[in-house]
């Protein structure tokens, strides 16, 4: 019986066993201990084959190769004559992975990290990898201030060489900062410096940013804030010498000590721009001008670099290198800035692509582009395309990427990635007020009809006082130059008396069409014509109404009037300025418009109306979660010549679109009715509107509580103050009106004010809008409508 010789017994092969210079020829290879791993797979990983002449070095390579597969805990190679016997112990297979006690770290994140490390169900268990994962997770907890945290991997053996892996977390509590000390500050107090930190040793109740829980990343950010604070104030030699973080014995408290050297303040001496600026030296120098005696400012240096990059980017130099080297003169305390520029290659756009537009046609997006294919890359043109796509209102998000073309020194591809939102809506609206009760509204509208960018809509309202229906159509690119064409037809049966307005009924129908002409990127003009037929009846003898009838040659008497009709043709003119950052939930920019309507010869009436609307959004923080919104609306109309503007063209205020908290259309003059054959006048609470209006609103858009970042683009909350007034410039106080106690409706000073909160949500079920407002300043006869909501269905 041949004697087996032990060749290798560990991972590191030694040369203790020597077979001679020529080794031996392998006639056969046998494996012992294989369970999960197939013999063929094991043989493929071995550098030795049957028939090979092997030496001690070859055996060592064999063992290392088998260990490298990660399938074995132990490998031994023995020789029985000319047969190699490979004895292995397989690593156990992971049958399941579970977690316990993890609150700060979600299971999905843990599974992703384990997957990235090769730890997954069905794979072999590598105890070294598990130990590294334990340490890595504990380091993570330490970095967020949980110094008492521990992570232990519990391995439970199962039959057939399998194991259950369970990670047990003991997270503990976050260590809180007991004190932050800054040593070496002479020009500024410690409190003044710490007030700019996120980490605090004391956090007032009103500070929603400050945090006493220690986090390593936040400390690093605060140190950078401290450095920027000094560099922006001329301290060019400022340095953070050291930072000590000490832990209390119970691991629940943290003391932070920051040692700094302020150094003296330095002034800017001059700025020298040099290098390859591709012929744009003078433009770069204009961007780097300084004032005499100006302090050194680190942020300004960064802005100079960014401005030069943006300037070159407009001319196709997409990847310039801009480096600033400050030359500090400690004798006269000045700094000379040397800005070296290398414009690099000019890049041209090969392709512009769109991703995510499953509904919208490519042509709808492409016509908004200002960057052209084949032209040099202009960063401002690329950004303009992004802004215009956002402004369409079809997309929740728009991102743009510029990628260099592999193998080409001067070509890039531009890719716009969009996430479409539901632009079609089937809306069912409900309004409820303390006086108005319940009203209903239905509407079908598609702002991006079949992905063409056209708007098609059918809207209707039905309540106690109105039956309204309209069909609208608008093509924003009626011509390739961006001339738009829109139109609508409508029918309206309005019973003013049921709406607590001045008593009359108006059955009207009409149509209008409008052409829009783009002037530049942000301005456009509109020209349109319209026709409307009004059939008035059930008119009660109301002072302002009778004043209008008399101005058009009617003698209504004092018992009411039936069967008065008008046909009017109008010329409609408008202007719009829009630089909002997006069409849906804007966060910055201004949108303003002026609209004018004037009757033309052939009309029964002669009047004009002018309205001005504006909305301005100002972000208050970097991520634009806090935004200040200001809105305003002005309106004025009057008759031409001796005629008055029709009373049914009056302006109204109150309701969700003007002054929330007040009933719709209820703000302003109230009806004064003739009585006793015109001998007297009586007061009422029926609103009649006026020929002049002013509305203003200030709104603070805030982060929505308890909403994850995933839904932040579809939910908006705000706190607002609305104000407005409506008046009649043709109103005349007479002895009759004064005797009836009727106020002077010609005054613009009777301003109503309300305050409240609002929530808007583009939900999967449709657009939902909630508002609750309470009148702060009102007048006798005003009616409130404090709560309103709107529910819709989108597709």
Swiss-Prot record:
Pfam families: Omp85, POTRA. Its main location: membrane. Disulfide bonds: none annotated. GO terms for biological process: Gram-negative-bacterium-type cell outer membrane assembly; protein insertion into membrane. Keywords: Cell outer membrane, Membrane, Repeat, Signal, Transmembrane, Transmembrane beta strand. Residues 1-20 form the signal peptide. Residues 24-91, 92-172, 175-263, 266-344, 347-421 form the POTRA domain. It comes from the Bacteria. Part of the outer membrane protein assembly complex, which is involved in assembly and insertion of beta-barrel proteins into the outer membrane. Constitutes, with BamD, the core component of the assembly machinery. This is Outer membrane protein assembly factor BamA. It comes from Yersinia pestis. The lineage of its organism: Bacteria, Pseudomonadati, Pseudomonadota, Gammaproteobacteria, Enterobacterales. The gene is bamA.
């Amino acid at each position: 019986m041949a004697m087996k010789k032990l060749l290798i017994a560990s991972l590191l092969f030694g040369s203790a066993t020597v077979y001679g210079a020529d080794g031996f020829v392998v006639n056969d290879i046998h494996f012992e201990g294989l369970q999960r791993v197939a013999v063929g797979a094991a043989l493929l990983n071995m550098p030795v084959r049957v028939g090979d002449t092997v030496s001690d070095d070859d055996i060592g390579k064999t063992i290392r190769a088998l260990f490298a597969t990660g399938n074995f805990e132990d490998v031994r190679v023995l020789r029985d004559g000319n047969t190699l016997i490979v004895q292995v112990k397989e690593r156990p297979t992971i049958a399941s992975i579970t977690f316990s006690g993890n609150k700060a770290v979600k299971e999905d994140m843990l599974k992703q990290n384990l997957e990235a490390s090769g730890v997954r169900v069905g794979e072999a268990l590598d105890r070294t990898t598990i130990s590294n994962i334990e340490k890595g997770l504990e380091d993570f907890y330490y970095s967020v201030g949980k110094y008492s945290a521990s992570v232990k991997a519990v391995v439970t053996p199962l039959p057939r060489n399998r194991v259950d892996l369970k990670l047990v977390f003991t997270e503990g509590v976050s260590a809180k900062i007991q004190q932050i000390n800054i040593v070496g500050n002479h020009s500024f107090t410690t409190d003044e410096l710490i007030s700019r930190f996120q980490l605090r040793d004391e956090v007032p109740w009103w500070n929603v940013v400050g945090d006493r829980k220690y986090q390593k990343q936040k400390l690093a950010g605060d140190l950078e804030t401290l450095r920027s604070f000094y560099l922006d104030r001329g301290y060019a030699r400022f340095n953070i010498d050291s930072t000590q973080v000490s832990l209390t014995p119970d691991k629940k408290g943290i003391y932070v000590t920051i040692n700094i050297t302020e150094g003296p303040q330095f002034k800017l001496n001059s700025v020298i721009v040099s290098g390859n600026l591709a012929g744009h030296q003078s433009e770069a120098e204009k961007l780097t001008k300084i004032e005499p005696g100006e302090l050194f400012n680190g942020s300004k240096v960064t802005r100079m670099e960014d401005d030069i990059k943006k300037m070159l980017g407009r001319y196709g130099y997409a990847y310039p290198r801009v480096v600033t080297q400050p030359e500090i003169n400690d004798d006269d305390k000045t700094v000379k800035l040397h800005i070296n520029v290398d414009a690099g290659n000019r890049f041209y756009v090969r392709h512009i692509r769109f991703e995510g537009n499953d509904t919208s046609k490519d042509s709808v997006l492409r016509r908004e582009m200002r960057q052209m294919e084949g032209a040099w890359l202009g960063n401002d043109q690329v950004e303009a395309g992004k802004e215009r796509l956002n402004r369409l209102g079809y997309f929740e998000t728009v991102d743009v990427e510029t990628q260099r073309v592999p193998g080409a020194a001067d070509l890039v591809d531009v890719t716009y990635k969009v996430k479409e939102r539901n632009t079609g809506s089937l809306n069912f609206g409900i309004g409820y007020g303390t006086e108005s009760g319940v009203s209903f509204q239905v509407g079908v509208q598609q702002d991006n009809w079949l992905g063409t960018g056209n708007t098609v809509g059918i809207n209707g309202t039905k309540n106690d006082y109105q039956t309204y229906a309209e069909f609208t159509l608008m093509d924003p690119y009626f011509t390739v130059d961006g001339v738009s064409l829109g139109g609508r037809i409508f029918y309206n049966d309005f019973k003013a008396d049921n709406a607590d307005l001045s008593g009359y009924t108006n059955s009207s129908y009409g149509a209008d069409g409008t052409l829009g002409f783009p002037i530049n990127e942000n301005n456009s003009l509109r020209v349109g014509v319209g026709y409307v037929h009004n059939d008035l009846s059930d008119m009660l003898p109301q002072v302002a109404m009778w004043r209008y009838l008399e101005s058009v040659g009617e003698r209504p008497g004092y018992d009411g009037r039936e069967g008065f009709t008008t046909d009017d043709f109008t010329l409609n003119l408008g202007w719009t300025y829009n630089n909002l950052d997006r069409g849906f939930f804007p966060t910055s920019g201004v949108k303003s418009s002026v609209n004018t309507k004037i009757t033309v010869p052939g009309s029964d009436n002669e009047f004009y109306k002018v309205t001005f609307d504006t909305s301005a959004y100002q972000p208050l923080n970097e991520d634009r979660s806090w935004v200040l919104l200001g809105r305003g609306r002005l309106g004025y109309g009057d008759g031409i010549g001796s005629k008055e503007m029709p009373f049914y063209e009056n302006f109204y205020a109150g309701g969700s679109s003007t002054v929330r908290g007040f009933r719709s259309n209820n703000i302003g003059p109230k009806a004064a009715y003739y009585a006793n054959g015109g001998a007297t006048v009586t007061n009422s609470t029926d609103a009649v509107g006026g020929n002049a209006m002013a509305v203003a609103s200030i709104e603070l858009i805030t982060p929505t509580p308890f909403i994850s970042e995933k839904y932040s683009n579809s939910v908006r909350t705000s706190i607002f103050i609305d104000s407005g007034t409506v008046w009649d410039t043709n109103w005349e106080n007479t002895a009759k009106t004064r005797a009836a106690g009727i106020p002077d409706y010609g005054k613009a000073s009777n301003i109503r004010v309300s305050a409240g909160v609002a929530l808007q949500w583009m939900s999967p079920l449709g657009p939902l809008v909630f508002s609750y407002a309470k009148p702060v300043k009102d007048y006798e006869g005003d009616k409130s409508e404090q709560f309103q909501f709107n529910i819709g269905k989108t597709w």
